[in-house]
Amino acid sequence: MSSIDPKQFGKVAVLLGGNSAEREVSLNSGRLVLQGLRDAGIDAHPFDPAERPLAALKEEGFVRAFNALHGGYGENGQIQGALDFYGIRYTGSGVLGSALGLDKFRTKLVWQQLGIPTPPFEAVLRGDDYEARAKEIVAKLGLPLFVKPASEGSSVAVIKVKSADALPAALIEAVKFDRIVVVEKSIEGGGEYTACIAGNLDLPVIRIVPAGEFYDYHAKYIANDTQYLIPCGLTADEEARLKVLARRAFDVLGCTDWGRADFMLDADGNPYFLEVNTAPGMTDHSLPPKAARAVGISYQELVVAVLALTLKD
């Protein structure tokens, strides 16, 4: 990778922590990002919006931000809007792409409209008759199902439901986290994959093989028995085709520069996109560093390359 003069970045804030359900993940990501940037000679400093007002960024002379916040206001367009207001360049998507990318329900509506394959689903609202909706959904989608709060990341409160009797309780649990819940048909037979996006870097698709039922919060950030397969087992042509489709799934939401698109394959190899992530985890368990490392890009090189995307017009 080409060398970049660290001085051109100016004073950089690494946004970490925040007050979402993913605070601990964000703190872990942010600390590693901070170290990577500092090791590259960049004038980087930690900044936790849960502890300090955002106005301090401008007051203290920050000109750029690496967004390592996950979920909540760090990923739903609010932080992005504030940074735009203060004239501070930042990593990742802007207001629209961030807001839409975090909202699984509206993401799937856009994908349906534009022909991006996504699993069949139903939406349940807080306050609905959960017993009645559960019966309707099982009749329409069958089993098994995934129940997901529309706007939580890191698989927070995602529940796999295998029996009709278990669905009402899963809905009651999920609406504690969001007023809209997505109930999605489980795609079986071909495995789970992710395509990492970082500007023009050509990163490999990763196949994810969790030891448990699915790739949940524990598998993502705690367990050491999740398998990450690179190469992912697809042919070169299949992988190239899925990278193009993943980029399109990302782009049509207004997402830019940096993120991830997650998808399943069915038994016939057909892809179904689940969600995008516009502020991916950057812990030692996270997927973008693994994809980068597989093609000879170090953690430090990756975070500098992502930050460098803020230099373009």
From Swiss-Prot:
Pfam families: Dala_Dala_lig_C (PF07478), Dala_Dala_lig_N (PF01820). Mg(2+) 2 binds at residues 275, 277. One of its GO terms (cellular component) is cytosol. It is found in: Cytoplasm. ATP binds at residues 138-193. Mg(2+) 1 binds at residues 262, 275. Pathway: Cell wall biogenesis; peptidoglycan biosynthesis. The keyword ATP-binding applies. The keyword Protease does not apply. It is an enzyme of class 6 (ligase). Keywords: ATP-binding, Cell shape, Cell wall biogenesis/degradation, Cytoplasm, Ligase, Magnesium, Manganese, Metal-binding, Nucleotide-binding, Peptidoglycan synthesis. Gene3D superfamilies: 3.40.50.20, ATP-grasp fold, A domain, ATP-grasp fold, B domain. Binds 2 magnesium or manganese ions per subunit. Residues 108-308 form the ATP-grasp domain. Belongs to the D-alanine--D-alanine ligase family. Cell wall formation. This is D-alanine--D-alanine ligase. The gene is ddl.
